[in-house]
Amino acid sequence: MRSSATKGAKLKNSPRERLSSFNPQYAERYKELYRTLFWLLLISVLANTAPITILPGCPNRFYRLVHLSWMILWYGLFVLGSYWEFVLVTTQRVSLDRYLNAIESAIYVVHIFSIMLLTWQCRNWAPKLMTNIVTSDLNRAYTIDCNRTKRFIRLQLFLVGIFACLAIFFNIWTHKFVVYRSILSINSYVMPNIISSISFAQYYLLLQGIAWRQRRLTEGLERELTHLHSPRISEVQKIRMHHANLIDFTKAVNRTFQYSILLLFVGCFLNFNLVLFLVYQGIENPSMADFTKWVCMLLWLAMHVGKVCSILHFNQSIQNEHSTCLTLLSRVSYARKDIQDTITHFIIQMRTNVRQHVVCGVINLDLKFLTTLLVASADFFIFLLQYDVTYEALSKSVQGNVTRYK
């Protein structure tokens, strides 16, 4: 926080103004990037998943205080709504559903707090991140494909919008249009998932941007190594340094979002197993579930599976680009010792595991992690079944004893 404040103070004087006044190309690229990301940034600021300082023209303290007040007000209403949902709705459910829903709601409260805390912490360095992206793209001669980026953003926001509309509609329907129950349930379960989805849209975009840049570097390296008679050592070294910077940036992105990722995995894991358990109960007792509840459960299953798979997919895409580059380097060999030494150094760098895809020290973000989640989910689901059978047997035993004593 202290270093962020120092960076923020430096920012007021210039990266933006200095570079734009001395480098017209930088100024044009900077405006182009903002135009491309504008709707995502605006929606993120309104949803409290990005600081208001990231918007052009909003760097001063007044806007920060307004945004902080909005975050505190929104979070206070959210926590209050979650409390009343627990008191008026969750406590009326059967034992197992009550416990799982209460834990899930508590995780959402903590998760939203972590997102907003991160938003406030990055108020100083978020504008500098935009500056660094433009500067590094200029250094590596990378031109942003605005249309492709806009399509990616539109797809992410479209998926969030579809989920929001369907979840709100079916939530109201399953609560039989009882207004207070519907509002409390939407506040406690739907809104946190909408907020986290908007937050992770930024995460997906950052990772996808890294993968696109890695691909471009690998294409440039391939041209240098295979299409030229004598590769230029300076160019290979430059590409190697750009790859190292992207690896460091990947690590920084995952470290920034690591607690949010952990809380999302825990929340998705609990809700996924709860929905599976409710599906099992619906199959065992068809009278317990109607059509709307089935559709609602399928919607939540799809949403949670989609979130987990998206996080792993975008990390895996970076690892695939990394492997492609390493394969290319391993295929070539040169008689000149200076070139071969440079290639060897590059290979060692690519093979060095700096744990850029590891979060919270234990979760390795690749598609293999799905196997771990499925095994854990199967074990937890078996536990829920055993608990349900035991609880039902104890309930019948207590009920029988009460009847006998009467």
Curated annotation (Swiss-Prot):
Stretches in topological domain Extracellular: 58-69, 121-154, 211-259, 386-406
A GO cellular component entry from the record: membrane
Keywords carried by this UniProt record: Cell membrane, Glycoprotein, Membrane, Receptor, Transducer, Transmembrane, Transmembrane helix
Transmembrane segments: 37-57, 70-90, 100-120, 155-175, 190-210, 260-280, 365-385
Origin superkingdom: Eukaryota
Main localization of the protein described in the UniProt heading: membrane
Gene Ontology biological process terms from the UniProt entry: chemosensory behavior; detection of chemical stimulus involved in sensory perception of taste; male courtship behavior; monoatomic ion transmembrane transport; signal transduction
Carbohydrate-modified residues: N147, N254, N401
Record's function text: Probable gustatory receptor which mediates acceptance or avoidance behavior, depending on its substrates.
Family named by the database record: Belongs to the insect chemoreceptor superfamily. Gustatory receptor (GR) family. Gr10a subfamily.
PANTHER family, per database record: GUSTATORY RECEPTOR FOR SUGAR TASTE 43A-RELATED (PTHR21143:SF123), INVERTEBRATE GUSTATORY RECEPTOR (PTHR21143)
Name this polypeptide is given: Putative gustatory receptor 59f
Organism for this UniProt entry: Drosophila melanogaster (Fruit fly)
